[in-house]
Amino acid sequence: MDNKKRLAYAIIQFLHDQLRHGGLSSDAQESLEVAIQCLETAFGVTVEDSDLALPQTLPEIFEAAATGKEMPQDLRSPARTPPSEEDSAEAERLKTEGNEQMKVENFEAAVHFYGKAIELNPANAVYFCNRAAAYSKLGNYAGAVQDCERAICIDPAYSKAYGRMGLALSSLNKHVEAVAYYKKALELDPDNETYKSNLKIAELKLREAPSPTGGVGSFDIAGLLNNPGFMSMASNLMNNPQIQQLMSGMISGGNNPLGTPGTSPSQNDLASLIQAGQQFAQQMQQQNPELIEQLRSQIRSRTPSASNDDQQE
């Protein structure tokens, strides 16, 4: 494989990591994004080309060179020296213990056991992916991203690593990148309903643009008021004689022009208001279903689901 492409990929991967965790100013981040685009165009690679990844990251390679350490063999060849049978068995035992700690929500202990398993067998993508899940439960999304990256480097066809990467990136409000990883997860596991759902949510987040006049949840009040269908129906509602009588009675302090014998004014007011609201909602649903769906989307609290990703391997 072309080592120039490997080097370009390593640099792009490093720059992406700096964007996420480097604590850079907005100007510096913009400069890095431009640099990434230039490198991707010049060498024909992207951060998704995980088959170009080396076992060590660029900072690890640089550190080894700066300290005079011998270049690890696995940087010259993807082949790794497999762990002994004893180490493999102990690593599996530690992983299982980590899984048990996840079940009882002892996430810090789970991180510890997965880390010990990684020390014995650093070529196992599952161990990194499981630790990423534990990091996410602790709110350490940056750590989860790094472990998912390592898992993907080890096994580029590991769908769960892409799915968990998407979750971590979503939690960091990196929805553009989250969408890319969810799509890759679905490409590898097309029947996974959780990936499908999370992809839709991430794409929705991308489409949601805050409005300068928005209220709670960045709802676009200006857009609603500029919607001719909405304004026409609202005008018809307010010109309804029954509604005008109702509002007049409520404003006058409880005088109930719609009242009937034996029924309190408040009951009539409430019933009339509910009826009018139902009629208005039905008209909106029939004439502008897209607007109704927008309203529902704003009201719902929608966050990515980790349902099947909670299951450790």
Swiss-Prot record:
Subcellular location as annotated: Cytoplasm; Nucleus
Disulphide-bridged cysteine pairs: none
Chief localisation class: cytoplasm
Gene3D superfamilies: Immunoglobulin FC, subunit C (1.20.5.420), Tetratricopeptide repeat domain (1.25.40.10)
Coiled-coil annotated spans: none
UniProt modified residues of type Phosphothreonine: 81, 303
GO molecular function: BAT3 complex binding; identical protein binding; molecular adaptor activity
Tissue expression from the record: Ubiquitous.
InterPro entries: SGT (IPR047150), SGTA_dimer (IPR032374), TPR-like_helical_dom_sf (IPR011990), TPR_rpt (IPR019734)
The keyword Zinc belongs to this UniProt entry's keyword annotation: no
TPR repeat ranges per the UniProt record: 91-124, 125-158, 159-192
Chain positions with Phosphoserine modification: 77, 84, 301, 305
Region (Disordered): 66-100, 250-269
GO CC annotation terms, alphabetical: cytoplasm; cytosol; membrane; nucleoplasm; nucleus; TRC complex
Pfam families: SGTA_dimer (PF16546), TPR_1 (PF00515), TPR_8 (PF13181)
Entry keyword set: Acetylation, Chaperone, Cytoplasm, Host-virus interaction, Nucleus, Phosphoprotein, Repeat, TPR repeat
Signal peptide positions on this chain: none
Biased composition (Basic and acidic residues): 90-100
Modified residues (N6-acetyllysine): 137
Function: Co-chaperone that binds misfolded and hydrophobic patches-containing client proteins in the cytosol. Mediates their targeting to the endoplasmic reticulum but also regulates their sorting to the proteasome when targeting fails. Functions in tail-anchored/type II transmembrane proteins membrane insertion constituting with ASNA1 and the BAG6 complex a targeting module. Functions upstream of the BAG6 complex and ASNA1, binding more rapidly the transmembrane domain of newly synthesized proteins.
Protein family (similarity comment): Belongs to the SGT family.
Domain notes: The second tetratricopeptide repeat (TPR 2) mediates the interaction with SARS-CoV accessory protein 7a.
Subunit structure: Homodimer. Homooligomer. Interacts with DNAJC5 and DNAJC5B. Interacts (via TPR repeats) with HSP90AA1. Interacts (via Gln-rich region) with SLC2A1. Interacts with HSP90AB1. Interacts (via TPR repeats) with HSPA8/Hsc70; the interaction is direct. Interacts with BAG6 (via ubiquitin-like domain); interaction prevents interaction between BAG6 and RNF126. Forms a multiprotein complex, at least composed of DNAJB12, DNAJB14, HSPA8/Hsc70 and SGTA; interaction with DNAJB14 and HSPA8/Hsc70 is direct.
Protein name: Small glutamine-rich tetratricopeptide repeat-containing protein alpha
Organism listed in the record: Homo sapiens
Lineage: Eukaryota, Metazoa, Chordata, Craniata, Vertebrata
